[in-house]
From Swiss-Prot:
Species this chain originates from: Helicobacter pylori (strain HPAG1)
Major localization listed first in the record, in broad terms: cytoplasm
Keyword Acetylation found: no
Subunit structure: UreH, UreF and UreG form a complex that acts as a GTP-hydrolysis-dependent molecular chaperone, activating the urease apoprotein by helping to assemble the nickel containing metallocenter of UreC. The UreE protein probably delivers the nickel.
Record GO terms (molecular function): nickel cation binding
Record GO cellular component, one term: cytoplasm
Record key words, sorted: Chaperone, Cytoplasm, Nickel insertion
Name the record gives this protein: Urease accessory protein UreH
Compartment(s) of residence: Cytoplasm
Family as reported in the entry's similarity comment: Belongs to the UreD family.
Database matches in InterPro entries: UreD
Length: 265
């Protein structure tokens, strides 16, 4: 059973306000979710932080998140801290997320890393619907466990799915299954001695494959690559032995893109 009285839900809908910047049109949330009001660190690029007033996900926790980014909005969504998945005993925790990005809208979805504790079991399913003119940066960073405590790959199972559609046609699907019981997570085809994994997707972003490759190559402590997916969109996969190198790489890519789409930055 969920710790809270009802399923944990979050709804966010944005639009362009009277001053031409992205604002919240409607929102709704149940515990432990909260939303910070948008702030504007760079011109018309809004930033909204998603808050979860809890120590992390437990057995039976189920999150239902729906984000609707209105036409012409430029928005960055972040989280407050690293997300912890605690021991889920004989159950699991889950998140179902649906994101819609409207015409000529830009979304940078940049949560902090996910840390599965010993015996944690997590299921995540994300569906993103775009228009042909939508722009997207979407990432997840998965940690091997409580690395500082030498707790590596002691979780039960972690399964995340990402499905991206453009004008209702699928352009990207990622199915990540990490099951230490059946797979040697440290072999060269998996983490190969690394402890942190970045998965980043860029759709319709003004950056070339060669530019992303250059940022990866100049990132100390990062072993990664970029590949082209459907319609010349890009996907970055990278490994490191800490969260900071991956967060810095992601930030460099995002900064280069936002400088182009928001010229006054």
């Amino acid at each position: 059973m969920n710790t809270y009285a009802q399923e944990s839900k979050l709804r966010l809908k944005t639009k362009i306000g009277a001053d031409g910047r992205c604002v919240i049109e409607d929102n709704f949330f149940t515990p432990p979710f909260k939303l910070m009001a948008p702030f504007y660190p760079k011109d018309d690029l809004a930033e909204i932080m998603l808050l979860a007033v809890s120590p992390g996900l437990m057995k039976g926790d189920a999150q239902d998140v729906q984000l609707n980014i209105g036409p012409n909005c430029k928005l960055r969504i972040t989280s407050q801290s690293f997300e912890k998945i605690h021991n889920t005993e004989d159950g699991f925790a889950s998140r179902d997320m649906h994101i819609v990005v409207g015409e000529n809208a830009f979304l940078d979805f940049a949560p902090f890393p996910l840390i599965p504790f010993e015996n944690a079991h997590f299921k995540g399913n994300t569906t993103i619907s775009l228009r042909s003119s939508s722009q997207l940066l979407y990432s997840e960073i998965i940690v091997a466990g409580r690395v500082a405590c030498n707790e590596l790959f002691q979780f039960n199972r972690l399964h995340t799915k990402i499905s991206i559609l453009q004008d209702e046609k699928p352009i990207y699907y990622d199915n990540t299954i990490l099951d230490p019981k059946t797979t040697d997570m440290m072999n060269m085809c998996m983490f190969d001695g690394y402890t942190h994994y970045l998965n980043l997707v860029l759709v319709n972003c003004p950056i070339e494959l060669s530019g992303v490759r250059g940022l990866i190559e100049e990132s100390e402590g990062v072993d990664g690559a970029v590949s082209e997916i459907a319609s010349s969109h890009l996907c970055v996969k990278a490994l490191a032995k800490g969260s900071e190198p991956l967060l810095h790489l992601r930030e460099k890519i995002a900064r280069l893109i936002t400088q182009t789409i928001t010229p006054k930055i």
